[in-house]
């Protein structure tokens, strides 16, 4: 049952996140977090690819691990494993590019842009390609993580609203581009 929900790809992403986090934690003087997104800095573009694997602390990585596993599993159940990889890849690129262009922060790390792209995709997929499965998954996703959307309206220090916002927008755009005929 779990192998139908949690894909090897999502487990691999989470394993890399935790591996990088543990290296940062255990080896003094080593930190990969400087590889995050540095907004509007040419060298910071590399952070678009690395940022989802970098986290600032235990609570940060936990806050991204659980939703990443669950939501990627919901995407997989809704549209299949191949399309899930597409959604996740474009979600990382879209949230990262939006964050790089528009964030007011100094350095942005974490997988929350990807998480929000998955939320945006699942909600929009139910709207643009309505099926019983897509609506069930969207309602469940909203029930579990809909409160996270409040981060668009509330300032929380050290949390990148830009990553959340552009991740969500990326998810909406992905669902729109993949909409199935009614």
List PLM regions with ranges:
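A detector for small-residue-rich transmembrane helices and their helix-helix packing motifs
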Residues: 1-182
């Amino acid at each position: 049952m779990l192998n139908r929900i949690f894909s090897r790809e999502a487990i691999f992403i989470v394993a890399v996140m935790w591996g990088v986090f543990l290296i940062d934690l255990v080896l003094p003087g080593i930190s990969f977090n400087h590889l995050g997104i540095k907004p509007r800095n040419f060298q910071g573009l590399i952070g678009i690819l690395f940022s989802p694997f970098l986290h600032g602390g235990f609570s940060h990585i936990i806050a991204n691990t659980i939703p990443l596993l669950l939501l990627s599993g919901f995407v997989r159940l809704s549209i299949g494993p191949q399309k899930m990889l597409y959604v996740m890849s474009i979600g990382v690129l879209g949230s990262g590019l939006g964050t790089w262009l528009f964030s007011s922060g100094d350095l942005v790390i974490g997988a929350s842009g990807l998480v929000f792209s998955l939320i945006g995709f699942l909600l929009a997929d139910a709207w643009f390609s309505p099926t019983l499965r897509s609506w069930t998954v969207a309602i469940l996703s909203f029930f579990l993580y809909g409160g996270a959307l409040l981060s668009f309206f509330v300032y929380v220090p050290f949390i990148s609203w830009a990553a959340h916002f552009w991740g969500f927008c990326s998810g909406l755009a992905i669902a729109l581009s993949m909409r199935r005929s009614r």
